[in-house]
Amino acid sequence: AHRTVAGAATALPPYRYFQLGLGVVCMVMIANLQYGWNLFVDPIDQQYHWGRAGIQWAFSIFVFTETWLVPIEGWFVDRFGPALVVALGGILVAIAWVIDSLADSLSVLYVAAALAGIGAGAVYGTCVGNALKWFADRRGFASGLTAAGFGAGAAATVVPVREFIAA
């Protein structure tokens, strides 16, 4: 299929809807790192008595690394391709969840937060960036749907995570 984007005819990849769907799934998978964080704060404090302020620093580290390192992650996408960057981002997120489960000090929690932020930023930035690239003719639709995956992931999993923590 061909579309005219800003006056230029461009060939649209036939697999772009599949790729968009994969991007949404990836966003669903990383959502609870950010939107589900508050579910973990009180249980962590009750177990370790680190204080809410100290524990919340982990979230600040996560948000900082998730957002401010995206330009560097974008460089990696340009150099090595989106599949590798998303895969490595997913691996970092998985490692961070494991470290979180084993964290016995704030410094370990902070390391996990940094790794989670780097991984989530790699996934988020790459998926949104590629949605824009694959859907130059429907940028708002593609980026909105991809970003909605982030919110949908939280909406679908917050209650089960809360129940799991309470069990």
Residue ranges, per PLM feature:
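Core transmembrane helices of Major Facilitator Superfamily
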Residues: 30-33, 115-127, 150
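Residue-level signature of mid-helix packing/kink "hotspots" within the transmembrane helices
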Residues: 35, 63-71, 155
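Intracellular juxtamembrane helix-capping segments at the cytosolic ends
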Residues: 44, 122-135, 142-143
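Helix-breaking motifs and short loop linkers at transmembrane-helix boundaries and internal kinks
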Residues: 49, 81, 102-107, 136
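Helix-to-loop junctions at the C-terminal end of transmembrane segments
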Residues: 68-82
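C-terminal ends and interior cores of transmembrane alpha-helices
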Residues: 91-104
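Paired small-residue
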Residues: 95-96, 107-115
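Helix-loop-helix hairpin linking two adjacent transmembrane segments in secondary transporters
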Residues: 150-167
